């Protein structure tokens, strides 16, 4: 029998806010345990939630980016279940009428373009974290993560292969980073995916019983987990068994999924409106104000890049949002290709030598443009621009002052350069004779000698021109 794979996804993205969804605690990753947990996050009595306005804004941005409906009235609900890292005994989430509804995202597969329907995206708070092994024989609880704002993005069961799932997740990952609503760090849990997978005989309309796969933190592992679970379910059904509705964990080391617990249905959580939170009212004026501030859609940006850059260059920029934003600021002044070369060849290579990560704050785009302007005005050479960048990275100061300090100002005095070139030709009569006899490659020898004699300060364009004039006399 031929079996068809049917998959729906639930992706949790941590929104990039400075404070939590309902408390003022910070959301910085990697801090000492329980140092970023307010009374509300710990579930202490007498505390009340206050909605983080920035989380609302970021949810609306996402909804607009996927052409979804933004709910004018949405509600927060209590999702009730018991787990040690859920201090209140319930999670504040959204059930009916979530903030984002009915969106779509187009993906590219080996069979062509496919539209994936997004059923909903709702706001909810993250849970804390159980810590094993910190205290011998005990499990600790760290509530730093509790209350961190999440946007859970739920698709319809539109996927029919692992390839489609990975293509969607990569596109979504790129989108949320591009929008600036999530840093997309999968290792730190900022972008997490649950896979709901079932199988059915080819051509059957009715869905099979699904299993939910958790604990998948890379695109490669998602592909492997899906293929394993598909094969497992086929084996179960073909041997006469029944697939159980359950949650399964993926073990990357063993490349297998293992049963974790029975999978709950919505009614098991006993959702009811949170009495401490008013309905969330979003006006048309608010939505319009956000539309005006939104960046180009990633598809629009990609189309512009592909007009001017090679495939590899486009992929590099699209996978590095901060660099792409920086690039856009430089490209609008000096052009697409020159901007790419300056950023990758001059700036990033200099940062690498200084053992520094790229950040738009280290050498702001305005500073790089000032350095480029000095090259264009023949004040410094292209080669010496890297020295200026390196000095700025080490000790930021005015670019003019750095050029003076390093003595990099080019000599553009024609008389001085001509005298220098004439002296070099006179000192190398054999090479000059060979040049006149047809060995034109010796031109670079004389240019190199002139640049060396001037300690790199002579204007290279003028040196080239004057060497040619003097040798052809």
Curated annotation (Swiss-Prot):
It catalyses: L-glutamyl-tRNA(Gln) + L-glutamine + ATP + H2O = L-glutaminyl-tRNA(Gln) + L-glutamate + ADP + phosphate + H(+); L-aspartyl-tRNA(Asn) + L-glutamine + ATP + H2O = L-asparaginyl-tRNA(Asn) + L-glutamate + ADP + phosphate + 2 H(+). SMART domains: GatB_Yqey. Pfam families: GatB_N (PF02934), GatB_Yqey (PF02637). GO terms for biological process: glutaminyl-tRNAGln biosynthesis via transamidation; translation. Gene3D superfamilies: 1.10.10.410. The keyword Glycoprotein does not apply. InterPro entries: Asn/Gln-tRNA_amidoTrfase_suB/E, Asn/Gln-tRNA_Trfase_suB/E_cat, Asn/Gln_amidotransferase, Asn/Gln_tRNA_amidoTrase-B-like, GatB, GatB_Yqey_C_2, Gln-tRNA_amidoTrfase_suB_CS, Gln_synth/guanido_kin_cat_dom. GO terms for molecular function: asparaginyl-tRNA synthase (glutamine-hydrolyzing) activity; ATP binding; glutaminyl-tRNA synthase (glutamine-hydrolyzing) activity. Keywords: ATP-binding, Ligase, Nucleotide-binding, Protein biosynthesis. Its EC number is 6.3.5.-. Heterotrimer of A, B and C subunits. Allows the formation of correctly charged Asn-tRNA(Asn) or Gln-tRNA(Gln) through the transamidation of misacylated Asp-tRNA(Asn) or Glu-tRNA(Gln) in organisms which lack either or both of asparaginyl-tRNA or glutaminyl-tRNA synthetases. The reaction takes place in the presence of glutamine and ATP through an activated phospho-Asp-tRNA(Asn) or phospho-Glu-tRNA(Gln). Belongs to the GatB/GatE family. GatB subfamily. This is Aspartyl/glutamyl-tRNA(Asn/Gln) amidotransferase subunit B. It comes from Francisella tularensis subsp. holarctica (strain LVS).
């Amino acid at each position: 029998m031929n079996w068809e794979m049917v998959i729906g996804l639930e992706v949790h993205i941590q929104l990039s806010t400075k404070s939590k969804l309902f408390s003022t605690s910070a959301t910085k990753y990697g801090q000492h345990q329980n140092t970023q947990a307010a009374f509300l996050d710990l579930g202490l009595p007498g505390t009340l939630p206050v909605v983080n306005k920035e989380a609302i804004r970021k949810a609306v941005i996402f909804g607009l980016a996927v052409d979804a409906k933004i709910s004018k009235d949405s509600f927060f609900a209590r999702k009730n279940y018991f787990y040690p890292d859920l201090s209140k005994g319930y999670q504040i989430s959204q059930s009916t009428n979530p903030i984002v509804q009915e969106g779509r995202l187009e993906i590219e597969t080996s069979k062509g373009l496919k539209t994936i329907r997004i059923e909903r995206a709702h706001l909810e708070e993250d849970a804390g974290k159980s810590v094993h092994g910190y205290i011998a024989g005990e499990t600790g609880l760290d509530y730093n993560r509790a209350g961190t704002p999440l946007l859970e993005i739920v698709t319809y069961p539109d996927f029919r292969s692992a390839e489609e799932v990975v293509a969607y997740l990569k596109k979504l990952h790129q989108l949320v980073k591009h929008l600036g609503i999530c840093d997309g760090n999968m290792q730190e849990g900022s972008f997490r995916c649950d896979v709901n997978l079932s199988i059915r005989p080819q051509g059957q309309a009715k869905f099979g019983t699904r299993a939910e796969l958790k604990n998948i933190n890379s695109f490669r592992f998602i592909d492997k987990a899906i293929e394993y679970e598909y094969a497992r379910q086929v084996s179960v059904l073909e041997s006469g068994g029944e697939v159980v509705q359950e949650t399964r964990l993926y073990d990357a080391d063993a490349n297998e999924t293992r049963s974790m617990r029975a999978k709950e249905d919505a009614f098991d959580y006993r959702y009811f409106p949170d009495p401490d939170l008013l309905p969330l009212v979003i006006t048309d004026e608010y939505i319009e104000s956000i539309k005006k501030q939104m960046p180009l859609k990633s598809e629009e940006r990609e189309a512009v890049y592909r007009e001017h850059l090679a495939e590899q260059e486009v992929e590099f920029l699209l996978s590095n949002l901060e660099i792409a934003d920086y690039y856009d600021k430089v490209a609008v002044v000096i052009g697409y290709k020159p901007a790419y070369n300056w950023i990758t060849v001059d700036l990033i290579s200099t940062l690498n030598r200084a053992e520094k990560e790229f950040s738009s704050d280290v050498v702001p785009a305005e500073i790089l443009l000032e350095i480029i302007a000095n090259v264009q005005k023949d004040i410094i050479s292209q080669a010496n621009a890297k020295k200026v960048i390196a000095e700025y990275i080490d000790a930021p100061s005015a670019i003019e002052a750095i050029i003076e300090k390093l003595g990099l100002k080019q000599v553009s005095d024609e008389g001085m350069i001509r005298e220098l070139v004439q002296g070099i030709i006179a000192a190398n009569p054999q090479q000059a004779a060979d040049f006149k006899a047809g060995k034109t490659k010796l031109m670079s020898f004389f240019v190199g000698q002139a640049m060396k004699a001037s300690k790199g300060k002579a204007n290279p364009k003028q040196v080239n021109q004057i060497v040619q004039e003097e040798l052809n006399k």
